[in-house]
């Protein structure tokens, strides 16, 4: 009994090498397209570090133009409150446990802006779990 390979059972080396080349090209090009297609907020969320390294000691609530609450998660173990001030272009990190900041958040919860309410609710929920 002899074992002979049929010609149809063999894989030509030319198609195998082109298949390997195609697989490597796809492997290296897919992550680049995925990173370019992701929105900016998704890329920020994938950074595994805290945004707020230092906290502002005090701030006038009338100077706050926008308030963003980032709940605790895999990127940072603590809740972060970031305020955009009316007279500055930089963001300021605030202490989420400060009584004044809690009052500002409660005032925002009473407002009509749904997105702002959602951010403030995330802060209240995460603060109650800590």
Curated annotation (Swiss-Prot):
A Pfam family this chain is assigned to: IL8
GO MF annotations in UniProt: chemokine activity; CXCR chemokine receptor binding
GO biological process, one term: positive regulation of receptor signaling pathway via JAK-STAT
Signal peptide: 1-37
Entry keyword set: Cytokine, Disulfide bond, Secreted, Signal
Compartment(s) of residence: Secreted
GO cellular component, one term: extracellular space
CDD domains found in the cross-reference section: Chemokine_CXC (cd00273)
Reported function: May participate in the recruitment of inflammatory cells by injured or infected tissue.
Family to which this protein belongs: Belongs to the intercrine alpha (chemokine CxC) family.
Name used for this protein in its record: C-X-C motif chemokine 5
